[in-house]
Amino acid sequence: MAIEPKVIEAFIEIPTGSQNKYEYDKERGVFKLDRVLFSPMFYPAEYGYIENTLALDGDPLDVLVIVSNPTFPGCVIDAKVLGFLNMIDGGEEDQKLIAVPTEDPRFKDVNSLNDLPKHKLDEIAHFFKTYKDLEGKKTEVGAYEDAEAAAKLIDECFARYKG
């Protein structure tokens, strides 16, 4: 029996369709342009993180929220976590949560990665496999894991943050 997806607040840094990589500077309370992607690619979903978490790469836990329309940097989205994509980036483990907004009726019946079009998951994996190629950096993309594994990962990252 499948578990109910965990609902989180996703703090969005980069809207769907952007080539700009923004990062939130907590000390200054502003969004800073970290870089523009070297490749003619764009973020395939809203990209951000869960506050008060600490992933294995030393940053807050990353989340992609698949939306009908782009939002904006600083938007907070209540989202159902469907699973995550395993990656290696810069030699470090890096997981990308995959989620959908709770407040969009188009995603009402989406409760697992299997409810998404396979092509969307392929787009996300392809993006993260190739988006740093022209920078001369390599990333490795692994398998997707389900909502139950994602819930465990989220709990671990909250606990790691609390130290």
From Swiss-Prot:
Organism: Halalkalibacterium halodurans (strain ATCC BAA-125 / DSM 18197 / FERM 7344 / JCM 9153 / C-125)
PROSITE patterns: PPASE
Record carries keyword Membrane: no
Reactions the enzyme catalyzes: diphosphate + H2O = 2 phosphate + H(+)
HAMAP family: Inorganic_PPase
Amino acids binding substrate: 21, 35, 47, 131
GO CC annotation terms, alphabetical: cytoplasm
Enzyme Commission number: 3.6.1.1
Superkingdom, natural source: Bacteria
Protein name: Inorganic pyrophosphatase
One MF annotation (Gene Ontology) recorded for this entry: magnesium ion binding
Biological function: Catalyzes the hydrolysis of inorganic pyrophosphate (PPi) forming two phosphate ions.
Uppermost EC category: hydrolase
UniProt KW keywords: Cytoplasm, Hydrolase, Magnesium, Metal-binding
Stated family: Belongs to the PPase family.
BP GO annotations: phosphate-containing compound metabolic process
Annotated positions binding Mg(2+) 1: 57, 62, 94
Predominant localisation class: cytoplasm
Cofactor(s) in the UniProt record: Mg(2+)
Entry-linked InterPro entries: Pyrophosphatase, Pyrophosphatase_sf
